[in-house]
Amino acid sequence: MSSILGLNDKQMEACSYTEGPLLILAGAGSGKTRVITHRIAYLIDEKSVNPYNILAITFTNKAANEMRERVDKIVGEGAEYVWVSTFHSMCVRILRRFYDRIGGDTHFTIYDTDDQKAVVKEVLKTLNLDPKQYSEKMCIKEISSAKEEFLHPDDLAARAGTSYREANIANIYREYEKRMRQNNALDFDDLIFQTLELFGKCPDVLHAYQERFHYIMVDEYQDTNHSQFLLVRYLAGGQKNLCVVGDDDQSIYKFRGANIYNILNFEQEYPDAKVVKLEQNYRSTSTILNAANAVISNNKGRKQKKLWTENEEGNSIIFNEYQDEYHEAEGVVDQLIQNHRNGVPFADMAILYRTNNQSRVLEEKLVMNNVAYKMVGGTNFYQRKEIRDLVCYLKCISNPSDEVSFTRIINVPRRGIGATTINKIRDEAAMQGC
């Protein structure tokens, strides 16, 4: 039982329940990641499960890497055979092997948002639609929402009914998909969408993965959308040893398509499911937890849980209201300066803000008061122009059908090739059926 030593009673219960559906309601700071990694170790060490037969799905590459490292430390040899992945990474691996079974090319390119905008821009020209009424950002969001609901263009058209705008969105979606196929490209939503298509049309492929994954764990289940729900249901349809971990109280991604009812209705989807609540918090003071419990208890339709801790009471919570963002920034910076005068190094202080546009006023106040600061975040490495250009060259080498990448780098470095020449090349390619 060394795999679960040091865990509290509820954590041990969650780790040792291995057969059948399991919902772990993990409150904030309750040791969720620790439970998942120790549960994997328990399956391998105590239940003699082959690591090859275990799948753990997380939402970010960072979380996946952290989980791999933790499992490796606990299990040691053999841990590398556990499939720890994000939804999208898992689907890429599956499609690289089997996408040709449903008419795709396994050497597809994955388009990011900027690539999608380039495709939508051409689609709007083709359909003679006003970009002011149908912005690239809006079109991408509508297409993404449709794919997250596992809706094809025809499904969207049928749903549109007599709505002129919705009918145009369906046409944009249809033309977008046509161009994506011509470019041998998939967007991030396609990775899950096409995997669902593959499993639906090729039951032998689905069966192979169901036979491989005897034990499936899904982290942050409250953040899953409908297509991710369908994917999990497909994979768990064989052995039915599905463990999902999440907290409906932490569901904040509805604007990204997350469906909170995936976790709220888990017991309806799996009537024989066991539920384990992790309510002991290791991160916060009791003052913070009492305030959080008081606020979240007003939510309707939530799964009841009450976080508690053995930690100290801690300082009182200070809540300040300001007239506007300028007074707020002034109040925040004044407090930082006061803390510094009381002996707290600036390096030990941080300002958290909800949206990027809030930083401007805060930065102005910091500069005015000669407070040195460092911004955490900024432009992602792969979003830098020179990196994107280089990646597009590599994409063209790997996938000659990738028109978006070709258009981006045809004049990088400058070769005197203008829009007229590019349009002639594009027209000639269309005539040649390229």
Question: How would you name each of these model-derived features?
Answer:
Residues 147-153, 239, 295-305, 430-434:
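Proline-centered turn/helix-capping motifs that create local helix->coil transitions or kinks
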Residues 5-16, 20-24, 55-56, 63-64, ...:
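Conserved helicase NTPase motor core
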Residues 28-36, 271-274, 279-372, 395-400:
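Helicase P-loop NTPase motor core
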Residues 20, 49-53, 78-81, 238-241, ...:
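Short glycine-/polar-rich loops that comprise or flank the Walker A/P-loop
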Residues 1-106, 110, 117, 183, ...:
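P-loop NTPase Walker
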Residues 79-82, 100-190, 213, 275-277, ...:
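ATP-hydrolysis module of ASCE/P-loop NTPase motor domains
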Residues 90, 125, 269-270, 312-316, ...:
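ATPase/helicase motor core of nucleic-acid motors
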